[in-house]
Amino acid sequence: MRVFVYCRVAHDDSFSLEAQAAQLRRYAEQAGYTIIGATAEQGSGLTLDRPGLEKVTQAVLAGKVDMVLVNSIDRIGREWGMTQAYIDLLIQHKVKLLCIRDRLLFDKQGVTYF
């Protein structure tokens, strides 16, 4: 499974970004996933207009990704309608979203708790 690792913090906290990235990489390795890309950024969760998330989106649109791996759902966005729209975009392109801390998997079947 080809995964893109996405990390975000709202405020300058490089330790938190590093911790997220390490946790997600470890999870991917243990699951046998192939990490095809990773990005970590500082930015507001109140908008989807973020350079790091745009990198994820471009990989999704190019068909390079099977799953986006995040620490928690709020790393995508803080407002549910906006976050749901992004999840819908992923699913339209047959890409899953796995939130490891929340233990949520979003895919064409809906949402699964694992």
Explain the meaning of each model-derived region:
Residues 1-114:
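Short, structured surface patches at the beginning of a domain
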